[in-house]
């Protein structure tokens, strides 16, 4: 993830009003064990070092990610191989995992609960030409569009 992208993530998340940013960071910690006070550079380092492949399994087992969303990050066969060899995810895979956790944490902070956030994230949006927000996370541009929509919702500009 570029320094610019990291800065955008921080700025977008910080726009969340009141306790929203704290809630976002607490949820990010619950999802990926990233300390609430971790700097953007520390998050960047975690991504470049590669998350443990088992995090993806845990998030799928907990229902945070569907198997289809998991496969958007890494194919199941490759994931199983990484786990068997005790290898971390690659930088690209870790970046995709972070984007999914980041958007999930933002949605949970905006909607106030995981169930509402999950429903919103899995429902096709006209704005995204019928794709779900989770399907948009395959690129940084798509992720930015989902962030912007969440911020508009947080600011009361509609669903």
Swiss-Prot record:
Keyword terms: DNA-binding, Toxin-antitoxin system
The terms under GO molecular function for this entry are: DNA binding
- Work out whether the entry's keyword set contains DNA-binding: yes
At the top level, the lineage of the source is Bacteria
Family matches, as Pfam families: Xre-like-HTH (PF20432), Xre_MbcA_ParS_C (PF09722)
Q: Which cysteines are joined by disulfide bonds?
A: none
This chain's function reads:
Probable antitoxin component of a type II toxin-antitoxin (TA) system. In vivo probably neutralizes the toxic effect of cognate toxin Res.
Q: What is known of its domains?
A: The homodimer can be superposed on the Cro helix-turn-helix binding domain, suggesting it probably binds DNA and can act as a transcription factor as is often the case with antitoxins in type II TA systems. The C-terminus of the antitoxin inserts into the putative NAD(+)-binding site of toxin Res, blocking access to the active site.
Q: How does it assemble?
A: Homodimer. Forms a complex with cognate toxin Res; the 2 toxin molecules dimerize and each contacts an Xre homodimer. Most Res-Xre contacts are between the antitoxin molecule closest to the toxin.
Q: Give the family per the record.
A: Belongs to the MbcA/ParS/Xre antitoxin family.
* Official protein name in the record: Antitoxin Xre
Q: Which organism is it from?
A: Pseudomonas putida (strain ATCC 47054 / DSM 6125 / CFBP 8728 / NCIMB 11950 / KT2440)
Q: Which gene encodes it?
A: xre
């Amino acid at each position: 993830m570029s320094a610019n992208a990291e800065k955008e993530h921080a700025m977008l998340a910080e726009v969340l009003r009141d306790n929203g940013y704290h809630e976002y960071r607490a949820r990010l910690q619950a999802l990926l064990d990233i300390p609430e006070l971790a700097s953007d550079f520390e998050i960047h380092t975690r991504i470049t070092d590669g998350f443990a492949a088992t995090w993806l399994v845990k998030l799928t087992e907990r229902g945070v990610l569907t198997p289809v969303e998991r496969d958007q990050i890494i194919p199941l066969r490759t994931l199983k191989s990484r786990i068997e060899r005790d290898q971390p995810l690659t930088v690209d895979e870790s970046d995709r995992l972070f984007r999914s956790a980041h958007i999930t944490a933002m949605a949970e902070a905006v909607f106030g609960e995981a169930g509402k956030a999950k429903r919103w994230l899995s429902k096709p949006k006209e704005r995204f030409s019928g794709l779900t927000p989770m399907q948009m996370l395959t690129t940084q541009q798509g992720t930015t569009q989902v962030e912007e929509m969440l911020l508009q919702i947080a600011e009361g500009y509609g669903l």
